[in-house]
Amino acid sequence: MVQQINIIDAKDHVDEKVKIGAWLTNKRSSGKIAFLQLRDGSAFFQGVVVKSQVSEEVFELAKEVKQEASMWITGVIHEDSRSKFGYEIEVEDIVVVGESEEYPITPKEHGVDFLLDHRHLWLRSKRPWAIMNIRNEVIRGTYEFFNQEGFIKMDSPILTGSAPEGTTELFHTEYFDRDAYLSQSGQLYAEAGALAYGKVFTFGPTFRAEKSKTRRHLIEFWMIEPEMAFMHQEQSLEVQERYIAFLVQGVIDHCQYALDILGRDVETLKKYTKLPYPRISYDEAIELLKENDFDVDWGVDFGSPEETFLADHFDQPVFVLNYPKAIKPFYMKPHPTRDDVVICADLLAPEGYGEIIGGSERATDYNYLLDQIKQAGLNPDDYAWYLDLRKYGSVPHAGFGLGLERFLTWITAEDHVRETIPFPRLLNRIYP
C-alpha cells in the first residue's frame, strides 16, 4: 500500500512512491509536460506530469484541473535543487476530490482591499502561510521560554469593569445591570497572579477602540504580559531581552523555509540574538534626537520617526528608560530621586518597527497609587481590589507587555501589522 505523507516530509521519502492530499495553487503545461504547483498546508512544492509516463486521462486532467481544486496525488519523490523547498513529486496519478470553479484570487497582483475582502482564501497563499507559521513558532516559543523560567500561565478576564491603561478608548457592552468593557490589558490581573504565584504570564486577545489607521495599529490584537514578584526593573529588562533573543533564535532554528519564502535575511535576525541590548535614558534619547536635527521637547512621547532613528542608531533593539510621568499610566513606580519620571522602559525594534515592548516596575505604595488613580480621573471603587494588593504583603514587582503582532511584523519584515494576524480587525474592517 502506498504511504500517505505530508509535503514537508518529502525529504524522508526520496525515490519512494507516496500519496499526498493537496490543492493546486498554479500550473503551466506544454505539449509533453505539465507542472503543478501544490500545497497541503505543511509546505509548497511542484508536481511534474510527463505525458509519456502517465495515462492520457491523467495528463489531460493535469492540464485542465482548476486553481485551488483539491486532489489526491500519487507519485515518486525526487530532489529538486532548483526550488527553495528542494523536492518535487513525479506524478503518476491524480484524483480530484473537490472542484474549484473561478477561484477569485488569480495568480496576478491584487489590491489590499480585495485581498482583505478575500482573507479567508488569501490565507492559502505562500506569504500568509509563511507568516502564520512564524506566528505559530513565536507562540510555541513563548510557552517554552516562560515554562523554563518558572512562570505560571494565568488567564485574565476579557470582560472587565475598569480600564488598566486609564483611557477612554474602550469597547463598551452591557453586563446585565451594569457597564462592562472589552479588556485592554491583562496586566492588573497578572499583578494579582504574581503576588499569588511569584511569576506569571498572560496571553490573550486585547481590544483598543483607537481610531487609528497607521501600519502599526490593530483594533484586536494579542498580548503577552508577564509579571514578576520580588523583582526590580533591571531584572525585568534582563528577562525581556532573553525572551526576545529566545524567540528570534527559535524562528531562525525552526522557520528557515518560511523565512526563505518571505525573503527575510537570517544574518540580520542573528544580530538580534546578541545580548545585552543597549540601554539609554529618555533624557539621553532626547539629546541624541536633538543632536540629529529632530525637533523634540522633553516631555513628549516619541512617534514613529523618533523610535526608528533611535533603534537604527544602535542597529539593535534598544531600551529607552524612565519616561516622563505625565505620559505614562498611573500604575508605574515613581523614580526614587525625581518626581517627573517613572521607572519604566520601552523596547524599540530596529528597521523602522518601533516599540514592541512596554514595561515598568509597579507602584507599591497604597496612598501614592490611590492618588494616581484619582489624578487619572478614574473611580477608586473600581480599583479597590487592585489597591488591596498594596495592603496585604506588597512587594517590589515588575512586568511588561509584548504585542504579538507588532513583534511578528518586525521579525517578518512586513510593511503592515494586519498581515501578521489571520483575520485583522481594523478601523473600517470587521469582515470576514
UniProtKB/Swiss-Prot annotation:
Keyword RNA-binding found: no
InterPro entries: Aa-tRNA-synt_II, aa-tRNA-synth_II, aa-tRNA-synth_II/BPL/LPL, Asn-tRNA-ligase, Asp/Asn-tRNA-synth_IIb, NA-bd_OB-fold, NA-bd_OB_tRNA
PROSITE patterns xrefs: AA_TRNA_LIGASE_II
Gene Ontology process terms (BP): asparaginyl-tRNA aminoacylation
GO cellular component: cytoplasm
Keywords on record: Aminoacyl-tRNA synthetase, ATP-binding, Cytoplasm, Ligase, Nucleotide-binding, Protein biosynthesis
EC number: 6.1.1.22
Lineage top rank: taxon: Bacteria
Keyword Phosphoprotein: no
Compartments where found: Cytoplasm
Gene3D superfamilies membership: Bira Bifunctional Protein, Domain 2, Nucleic acid-binding proteins
GO molecular function: asparagine-tRNA ligase activity; ATP binding; catalytic activity, acting on a protein; nucleic acid binding; transferase activity
Catalytic reactions on record: tRNA(Asn) + L-asparagine + ATP = L-asparaginyl-tRNA(Asn) + AMP + diphosphate + H(+)
Quaternary assembly: Homodimer.
Family membership noted in the UniProt record: Belongs to the class-II aminoacyl-tRNA synthetase family.
HAMAP family linked to this entry: Asn_tRNA_synth
Record-given protein name: Asparagine--tRNA ligase 2
Species this chain originates from: Lactiplantibacillus plantarum (strain ATCC BAA-793 / NCIMB 8826 / WCFS1)
